[in-house]
Amino acid sequence: MAVHRSLLNKPTWCRVAFWWWMLVMVMRIQGTNGKEQDSVIKLPTQEVDAESDEVGTRWAVLVAGSNGYGNYRHQADVCHAYQLLIKGGVKEENIVVFMYDDIATHELNPRPGVIINNPQGPDVYAGVPKDYTGESVTSHNFFAVLLGDKSKVKGGSGKVINSKPEDRIFVYYSDHGGPGVLGMPNMPYLYAMDFIDVLKKKHASGGYKEMVIYVEACESGSIFEGIMPKDLNIYVTTASNAQENSWGTYCPGMYPPPPPEYITCLGDLYSVAWMEDSESHNLKKESVEQQYQSVKQRTSNFEAYAMGSHVMQYGDANMTAEKLYLYHGFDPATVNFPPHNGRLKSKMEVVNQRDAELLFMWQVYQRSNHLPEKKTDILKQIEEIVKHRKHLDGSVELIGVLLYGPEKASSVLRSVRTTGLPLVDDWTCLKSMVRVYETHCGSLTQYGMKHMRAFANICNSGVSETSMEKACVAACGGYHAGLLHPSNTGYSA
């Protein structure tokens, strides 16, 4: 296009106005010649496409199911998710946040009052509402909030998901897990069948149009495997299948590393994968399926499954064609971002969720050289943790021997059911067996959650509660759990 020479002699503001006018005219010409082309660069304030944004109200429940500075990453994940939704236009009044809220001001936090979820990331803590913190972070409150039942909430802000039939709900959970369970900082744990029953009840009440659930936890697939209906208008992805660990990342001593002053992991592999994906794409263009495929690849650590996991899908597969903005909202700053791109193609070093605690403790120990008394105390704590882990592993194995004999014990306890079958046939039995075990052998802890499959298999094989109790007494007689007895920690079932 020729530009008249006289224009070059005009003041700067005139030249800017001319080019602005030309840009508008090009856009109008594109619009009159049919459907607007994706190649046209749009302004953040422009409509992305003709698709209506009338989607009812977007709601979200964000849950960090742990506490303690060693579990920094779970609250960081949830705070990051909150900021992403806010940028997408989801209203604060429609987002319910569960987090213990003990890491931002923790004495070990090198940036007091700040939480980050990426080594170069911004503070994600500022502005996050403290709906349910401390002792109010419970599975009971989570269920009450999701059902919109204020009368059942105990403590906290009282905010609930008061959704209507035309509304959409996004649920995100990050913490430790085990076969059939998700952790909570206050006992009991969240059991899979209880969660599914709540989802069924929410659906029966007509309390939403569609729901998307993301779950970050070890063995998170077991929460839905064989028990998640396909007709609830709910789509689920999980960080792992029913028998895998999930992974912490951005950890000290690993690549990519956190800032050198941090002694704990900043995020979780599946969680940072979906959030960093959402932040780098136009969510009015990217579908649920496209994000699933991207997150699946990254969470597998690009098919390095020894240091990654299989992201799984459950529920209503018909929802995968929907655009993500229906749940995460739309950030106008991403208007010119592609629906998918090749960002973050490199592998990441990770740590097993259950070993992240020991990694953190070891970092504290190594950085306490100038404080010999503290170093001795930390070493003692590490030894106690390892001792209890060995006790948990050994006692469960011995219980199996007492119930099934030495030849069959290991195969029965570790047996994994065929894909499509639930972990256990009788969930009440599972809870009973866990309580019997913890009474005599001590709290399972976030590490011992991995033994839930053994207790489920004990139920599936028809062992009575009386026989289980006798085996637990024989296996754990004389063991003193101390602070790890359920009288101090609470029962996980």
From Swiss-Prot:
The entry's keywords: Disulfide bond, Glycoprotein, Hydrolase, Protease, Signal, Thiol protease, Zymogen
Biological role stated in the UniProt entry: Asparagine-specific endopeptidase involved in the processing of vacuolar seed protein precursors into the mature forms.
UniProt similarity note: Belongs to the peptidase C13 family.
GO molecular function, one term: cysteine-type endopeptidase activity
Residues of the site described as Required for post-translational maturation and enzyme activity: 265
One Pfam family from the record: Legum_prodom
Taxonomic classification: Eukaryota, Viridiplantae, Streptophyta, Embryophyta, Tracheophyta
Glycosites: 318
The keyword Protease is annotated on this UniProt entry: yes
Cysteine-cysteine disulfides: 251-265, 429-459, 441-476
Residue numbers covered by the propeptide annotation in the UniProt entry: 35-53
Signal peptide: 1-34
Top-tier EC class: hydrolase
GO CC annotation, single: vacuole
EC number: 3.4.22.-
Protein name, per record: Vacuolar-processing enzyme
CDD domains per the UniProt record, alphabetical: legumain_C (cd21115)
A GO biological process held by the record: vacuolar protein processing
Catalytic residues as annotated in Swiss-Prot or TrEMBL: 176, 218
InterPro entries, per database record: AE, Legum_prodom, Legumain_prodom_sf, Peptidase_C13
